[in-house]
Amino acid sequence: MARITVDDCLEKIPNRFQLTLVAAYRARQLANGAEPLVNVHGSKDKPTVLALREIAAGKVGLEVLNRGHA
């Protein structure tokens, strides 16, 4: 798979501090068994890399931080 960069993710979430929070939260969800939202067949990517791939693909955004705080 192509290498993911922080710049790819910053196009979706321009604030790097919010990007860090979203990536960490989503990586924790993936590590706890959540289904990946991007195609991963046979990929050995760690949850943090998967989270960044999902953000760069536009599948995950700031909305994950607002869930449960309604």
Curated annotation (Swiss-Prot):
Keywords, alphabetical: DNA-directed RNA polymerase, Nucleotidyltransferase, Transcription, Transferase
One cellular component (GO) term of this entry: DNA-directed RNA polymerase complex
Documented EC number(s): 2.7.7.6
GO terms, biological process: DNA-templated transcription
Pfam families linked: RNA_pol_Rpb6
Enzyme class: transferase
Recorded GO MF terms: DNA binding; DNA-directed RNA polymerase activity
Catalyzed reactions: RNA(n) + a ribonucleoside 5'-triphosphate = RNA(n+1) + diphosphate
Record InterPro entries: DNA-dir_RNA_pol_omega, Pol_omega/Rpo6/RPB6, RPB6/omega-like_sf
Matches recorded under SUPFAM superfamilies: RPB6/omega subunit-like
Quaternary structure (record): The RNAP catalytic core consists of 2 alpha, 1 beta, 1 beta' and 1 omega subunit. When a sigma factor is associated with the core the holoenzyme is formed, which can initiate transcription.
Function field: Promotes RNA polymerase assembly. Latches the N- and C-terminal regions of the beta' subunit thereby facilitating its interaction with the beta and alpha subunits.
Similarity field: Belongs to the RNA polymerase subunit omega family.
Protein name: DNA-directed RNA polymerase subunit omega
Organism for this UniProt entry: Methylobacillus flagellatus (strain ATCC 51484 / DSM 6875 / VKM B-1610 / KT)
